Design a protein with these regions (language model features):
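Short, charged helix-capping/linker segments at alpha-helix termini
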Residues: 2-5, 19-28, 38-57, 156, ...
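Amphipathic, Lys/Arg- and hydrophobic-enriched alpha-helical face
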Residues: 30-48, 65, 80, 147, ...
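Structural recognition of an alpha-helix C-terminal capping motif at a helix-to-coil junction
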Residues: 39, 53-60, 73-85
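Arg/Lys-rich amphipathic alpha helix in sigma70-family domain 2
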Residues: 67-71, 84-102, 108-113, 136, ...
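Short, Lys/Arg-enriched C-terminal cap helix and immediately downstream tail that follows
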Residues: 70-71, 92-95, 150, 155, ...
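Helix-turn-helix DNA-binding module
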Residues: 141-181
Length: 204
């Protein structure tokens, strides 16, 4: 509890420094949140150069708009929101073509792991085989390909939930969507990645 209070106090002081225009405030912001911003930006854009540009854009946005932060949510939540929007906009700027609807290229699965409409296809259950789930170099490559294939909005939810460890409610607040929608998209994104790995593991 005390750590959370200390963190909130540090954020409050950092924000106050930004509003006062103090020279070291932006550097302090970068040191405190830079890694988080880059991690999320890369998770959405899947491109190092784009993620670095998003990082710079977000830091400048925070420096310019620090006065508009009303404190209704944690500073970190606000930064997540700014970063997610910036990363998604970066992707939209690079891909003008209309993306295929997620329903057309992401499979759906039943709770027992079977693909909807196909009882012969069952996702591998790795929970009882920890050695098999270890991400070796080749398997990691397959996972990266699966992430690349996800629409950016789904990647954003996946990174916020599974990498940044936000709750479903926090993710919904960041992206401006309902909790039910977050849960649905998160499930489909996870299942798509799991199917990608299942296919790879099944290869001789």
């Amino acid at each position: 509890m005390s750590q959370a209070i200390d963190s909130a106090a540090a954020d409050f002081e950092l924000l106050a420094s930004l509003r006062r225009g103090e020279g070291g405030a932006l550097m302090a912001l970068a040191e405190r949140y830079g890694s988080m911003i880059y991690r999320l930006a890369f998770g959405v854009t899947r491109n190092q150069a784009d993620a670095e540009e998003v990082l710079q854009d977000v830091l400048l946005t925070l420096a310019r708009k620090g006065e508009s932060f009303e404190g209704r949510s944690a500073l970190g939540s606000w930064i997540y929101r700014v970063t997610t929007n910036a990363a998604l906009n970066k992707r939209r700027g690079k891909r003008r073509e209309v993306e295929v609807s997620i329903e057309e290229h992401l499979p759906t699965f039943e709770a027992d792991g079977h693909r909807s409409g196909d009882r012969t296809y069952l996702l591998a259950d790795w929970s009882q085989d920890p050695e098999r789930t270890a991400l070796a170099g080749e398997t990691r490559r397959v996972l990266e390909q699966g992430l690349d294939a996800l629409p950016p909005h789904y990647r954003a939810i996946l990174v916020l939930r599974d990498v940044e460890d936000l709750s479903n409610e926090q993710v919904a607040e960041v992206i401006g969507d309902s909790v039910a929608s977050v849960k649905s998209r998160l499930h489909r994104a996870r299942m798509a990645l799991r199917e990608q790995l299942t296919r790879h593991m099944a290869q001789p």
